[in-house]
Every structure is written in structure tokens, then in C-alpha cells.
């Protein structure tokens, strides 16, 4: 299925980026229990194949049967049926992590700090609450519209891979080619540590803009109940 292909792409891109040393913003953390340094993401599974993902059971089918599916069909009459396609293999990996983003104005330059990028615009909205992770595409679309831009004006997108269908929706709704979206893998491969994912994605985007000598990027995340937040950044 298409969702499984998105998941495999995320895994392979993340593995390649890790092996090539693209995740340069990772700060190693010492693990005293195992007496070792953790210096790379441990969720990446490049060995997975289509046959592995095909064996996994849909995770939300039981929840849908409790009445959630019926509510969706009532609220969205154009839907004829709901197909549960998300499994543990094409959903965000559970992970522990932390992220740090230093924000400031021009006065920081007096502290010997060199800015890497600046935020040009930001948008937060709540879309249809029943479409839980639809906010990512909606927030990005509004951000671009408000700035008089189209997706063609943006060099790279780092959009929250909260379930593979989110990536499919973003590509379709925003007309983004796979060559500009989550180019080093997303949270399906790298993990989704609550409260840290946004900062990690922003760091990944800036790193890749620098590596490719590109200028503009959009980073966006989804939240529950259709919430979405998007940032437009420019490399300095």
C-alpha cells in the first residue's frame, strides 16, 4: 500500500542520512546504565521490507469499532467507508529525546553567537478535529497563502510524519514533490518524542538547507484535534 511505501522511504532516507553524517546537530548523551554514549537515533529500521509491513495489523480498527468510525461517517457524508491502514510500521516510532532551539534578536550577535536562520512567518490553526492529523497540511497551506507564496517557492519542507497518510495528504494538497519533503526521513523512522519533535525537525531543516546551500524552508507539525503549526524560515 502507499502508506507502507511512505514508511519504507522514511526508513531508507533516515538510514542514508545517518550513515552519511547529515545529522550533525545531534549532541551525544552518556548512558550510565549501559556505560556508553548514545550518538545516533536508534529507531531507524532500514532492513524492513514491504513483506514485513504487510504482516502488521491495523492499529486503530478496534477504536473505530467503538463508535469513532460511525461518527466520522456521520460528520462526513461523502465518505462511504473507512479503511484502517495504519500499523506500527507506518506510524511514528515511540522515542525518548530532547531538543534545544536558541531564539533571539540581533542583540545575541554581541554574545559571539552566529545566527543560522530567521523566522519569516508562523501560523497555528485548528482544522477539523475529527481529522486528527490534518492540521499539518492546513497550517502549511495557510502560511503560504498569507505570505503570497506557493509550494514552488520553498526549497525544502520538513512536515510532521504523524502517520504515513499525513505525508500523502501534504504531497497531494500542497503539490510537493517527494524530492523536497522530509528528505532525510521523518518521525516514522526517527521517532516522535513528545515536546521535542518540533525542535528536532527545525534543526534537521536548517542543517539540510546549509548542506545543500539552499535558502527557504517550511517546518510544520500536527497536533491532536486537527491542530497544526507551521514556520517559514530563511537561512542566513
What does each model-identified segment do?
Residues 2-110, 173, 178-180:
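N-terminal extracellular/periplasmic Venus flytrap/periplasmic-binding protein-like
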Residues 4, 8-15, 50, 54-57, ...:
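Predominant activation on well-ordered alpha-helical scaffold segments within soluble catalytic domains
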Residues 109-113, 141-156, 174-177:
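Phosphate/pyrophosphate-binding loops at sites that engage ATP/ADP/AMP, CoA/4′-phosphopantetheine
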Residues 79-83, 87-106, 198-236:
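Conserved beta-strand-centric core segments of catalytic alpha/beta enzyme folds
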Residues 19, 145-148, 210-211:
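Residue-level signal for alpha-helix termini/capping positions
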Residues 2-9, 26-31, 113-124, 152-161, ...:
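Beta-strand segments within the central parallel beta-sheet cores of soluble alpha/beta enzyme folds
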Residues 36-39, 43-44, 129-136, 161-179, ...:
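Short glycine/threonine-rich loop-to-helix capping motif typified by GTGT followed
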Residues 2-6, 83-99, 120-146, 159, ...:
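Active-site pocket-shaping loop/turn-to-helix segments
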Amino acid at each position: 500500500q502507499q502508506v507502507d511505501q511512505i514508511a519504507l522511504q522514511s526508513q531508507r532516507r533516515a538510514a542514508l542520512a545517518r550513515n552519511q553524517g547529515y545529522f550533525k546537530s545531534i549532541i551525544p548523551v552518556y548512558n550510565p546504565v549501559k556505560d556508553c554514549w548514545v550518538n545516533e537515533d536508534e529507531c531507524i529500521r532500514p532492513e524492513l521490507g514491504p513483506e514485513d509491513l504487510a504482516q502488521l495489523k491495523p492499529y486503530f480498527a478496534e477504536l473505530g469499532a467503538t463508535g469513532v468510525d460511525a461518527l466520522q461517517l456521520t460528520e462526513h457524508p461523502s465518505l462511504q467507508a473507512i479503511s484502517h491502514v495504519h500499523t506500527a510500521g507506518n506510524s511514528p516510532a515511540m522515542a525518548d529525546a530532547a531538543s534545544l532551539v536558541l531564539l533571539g534578536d540581533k542583540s545575541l550577535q554581541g554574545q559571539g553567537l552566529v545566527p543560522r536562520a530567521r523566522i519569516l512567518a508562523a501560523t497555528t490553526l485548528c482544522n477539523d478535529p475529527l481529522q486528527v492529523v490534518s492540521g499539518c497540511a492546513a497550517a502549511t497551506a495557510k502560511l503560504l497563502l498569507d505570505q503570497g507564496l506557493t509550494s514552488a517557492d520553498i526549497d525544502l519542507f520538513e512536515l510532521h510524519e504523524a502517520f504515513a497518510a499525513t505525508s500523502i495528504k501534504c504531497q497531494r494538497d500542497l503539490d510537493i514533490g517527494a524530492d523536497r519533503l522530509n528528505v532525510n526521513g521523518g518521525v516514522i523512522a526517527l521517532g516522535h518524542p513528545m515536546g521535542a519533535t518540533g525542535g528536532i525537525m527545525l534543526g534537521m531543516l536548517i542543517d539540510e538547507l546549509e548542506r545543500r546551500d539552499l535558502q527557504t524552508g517550511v517546518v510544520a507539525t500536527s497536533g491532536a484535534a486537527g491542530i497544526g503549526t507551521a514556520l517559514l524560515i530563511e537561512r542566513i
